[in-house]
Amino acid sequence: LPSQFLENWCWEEDALNFISGHYETGEPLPADLLERMLAARDYQSAMQMVRQLEFSLFDFLLHSEKGSTVDVQGVLDSVRDEVAVSVPPSFNRFQNGFGHIFAGGYAAGYYSYKWAEVLSADAYSKFEEDGIFNRETGKAFLSNILEMGGSKPPMELFVAFRGREPKVDALLRHSGIKG
């Protein structure tokens, strides 16, 4: 949560003006450039989200198969048939290099990337509601999330900060997905 959460301030004009400036003049980032950056951030974000969900579902199903032999390509094909917007050509073997789920310590855990985005966006939405530099909200995040680390179950920490369980709404909004 913290690493993705902190990225949110890099998309806020007030935060960018506070932490950055032109290397020679000190002038802030021009507003029109920030607007173009914000527009580009959401470009095909729904496609990227579906792709991440495809990877997560593939990972779950692959690691839920019992027995010594798994038809990896068959599992991937069935996932793609169900969720892919654009199915790669049959010669594509991306799974052979998908190290996250085989050698990266994320076996049956690839979904955690998307879950971290849900938590990050929802936690940040509290700052959007209260003001991105709100001292009390910052202290609450510090004491309920950062200082606690892994000392309590993550959901308990999130609820202590946000006052409720996570919702996906903020991630969809931050991704430019309306619906």
Predicted features by range, described:
Residues 1-179:
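Cation-handling catalytic/transport regions enriched in His/Asp/Glu
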